[in-house]
């Protein structure tokens, strides 16, 4: 038979497992770590200014719109990076994940070819493929770090300075002006 204390601990455990993730607050610093589809470790506090977007398959066009709003002056600058986290909302079976990662890498290769024109015009010697980051979040661990529920259909954009301080957060694609202001503040 359960005693009152055991009921209390049972309720405490159940409550802890059902609480939503805490939303990140602008001005606070966060040492978040993600692993992209190329197995590169990306941290919000490693000296890079990071634009982090969270997208699902349904709002993928917003990620493209965000990329189009990043000012070209930041293209190829190793101090800045755009990280797209694809939230698969825990809906992909493990055997399919490798195939999906291969498809994502193929799409990144194609995007790098498009970016090569911009890099050539700006006389950048870097390989644009090295500047494109996508995190395939199959299990919800990446979005949970950002205070989002793993099954959330939400789109979000975060800008972190090089020390991991959250400069801005949006729940939609920010204007080019707002994004530029956040990047300048994050420098």
Model-found features: residue ranges?
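Structural microenvironment flanking redox-active thiols in thiol-disulfide oxidoreductases
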Residues: 60-127
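Structural cue for short, hydrophobic secondary-structure segments
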Residues: 51-55, 84
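A short beta-strand-turn-helix
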Residues: 31-49
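Positively charged n-region of N-terminal signal peptides that target proteins for export
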Residues: 1-6
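Bacterial N-terminal signal peptides
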Residues: 7-18
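Boundary at the C-terminal end of the N-terminal hydrophobic targeting segment
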Residues: 21-23
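A short, polar/charged loop-to-alpha-helix boundary motif
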Residues: 174-187
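Thiol/disulfide oxidoreductase modules built on the thioredoxin-like
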Residues: 45-46, 128-131, 137-175
